[in-house]
């Protein structure tokens, strides 16, 4: 399960380390702001120009472009589960699997998708 790094994400890289259970909470806000612009254009360091499955790991391929589906990060399948309307950081925490209301089972930007208005 990934934490918050986007390759060139400034605020979170060092602290995330092994991407364990405590990563989602510890890096939430800073990573969202730091990665938004840089990752939105190309899904982070490992994805090149597309999102077609030639990505390295979920830690190097964490952001979706507009219209870019979750095939970009295999370990994010079932988390964001599809295309996002805006570039976001995919939250791949186990706690999100219990989210089954509103717009679906998944989460974006470190929050579980249990609302009518949702990015996924």
UniProtKB/Swiss-Prot annotation:
Taxonomic superkingdom: Eukaryota
Region (19 X 2 AA repeats of CG): 4-104
Disulfide feature: none
Record carries keyword Repeat: yes
UniProt entry keywords in alphabetical sequence: Keratin, Repeat
GO CC terms: intermediate filament
Family: Belongs to the KRTAP type 28 family.
Entry function: In the hair cortex, hair keratin intermediate filaments are embedded in an interfilamentous matrix, consisting of hair keratin-associated proteins (KRTAP), which are essential for the formation of a rigid and resistant hair shaft through their extensive disulfide bond cross-linking with abundant cysteine residues of hair keratins. The matrix proteins include the high-sulfur and high-glycine-tyrosine keratins.
Other remarks on this protein: Human have a similar number of genes as other primates despite the relative hairlessness of humans.
Protein name as annotated: Small cysteine and glycine repeat-containing protein 2
UniProt organism field: Homo sapiens (Human)
Gene: SCYGR2
